[in-house]
Amino acid sequence: MKEPEISVGIVNAQEIHFSLNGNFFAKGETVCGEQQVAFSEGGILWNGNLYRELTFTPQDEHASFSLYDVTIGINFHWERQETQSFMGTLKLVVDEGKITAINILPAEDYLISVISSEMNATSSLEFLKAHAVVSRSWLFAQIEKRKALSDKNEGFFSFIKTDTEYIRWYDREDHTIFDVCADDHCQRYQGITKASSAAVTEAVRATRGQLLMYERGICDARFSKCCGGASEEFGYCWEDKNYPYLSTIRDAEEEENRPLPDLTKEEEAERWIRTSPVSFCDTHDKKVISQILNNYDQELQISIVGKYVIPKQNYPN
């Protein structure tokens, strides 16, 4: 099977300032250096001309591009703007009165950046391998879901309405012009800006093409780097359906010896929240935290470590 290319939405703004670090091909000419585009009269204004979309294709494998003022950590405590650099193709399209910058690149190259953006590139090799498989599975599960909805000419919409309640699920399927976004809403993807390592590249290459499967389908492998000591049912978080491999479990070693209390009971839930139950996340080992978390994830002084919510017993053989 040929490695697929994926499209990642990076930034959406009225004006976008970027730099082509090498030779790129666009609108019949070779261009490089500093560039500026602006939304104008329903199109993209670049070098005095209006376009519906623009594609900048690298002329060699070493060419990259940098986008300025990219917001990361949207609505998180560490939200900030960065200059980020990327390999691959840069595509600019008009979307709802703004310009969206999209990076198109091979899936495995995308994963190398995801691992270094979500977690720290200094993490252990086996940890990085597990992350590569989980992130790859999540990515392809979303692409398959998006394709299925497109084939049926359906959009993502999931809600329950009763006389007293209106419950709406908001997932990442609201992306219609690219496969995934670059922030925590999907998976963090910060291009080649984040320091990578030989171990990250080895982890992705060693697991190339490996996916988590369940009943001949790709697992929708949701994951988190912090928790409250227990995982939640998929259907209460993402969509009105449940998967056996994304069920509620105790997030701790020797799970079978540490039964999870019934957190649907108010008194049990309050006790759980107000105390510090034994869990993978409950660590104060600064060495471990600094090894696996990027700097901005350590700015809020709480105990968090990486832990995936896929139950081990449901991993495919």
PLM features: residue spans?
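Conserved, single-site charged/polar hotspot
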Residues: 1-317
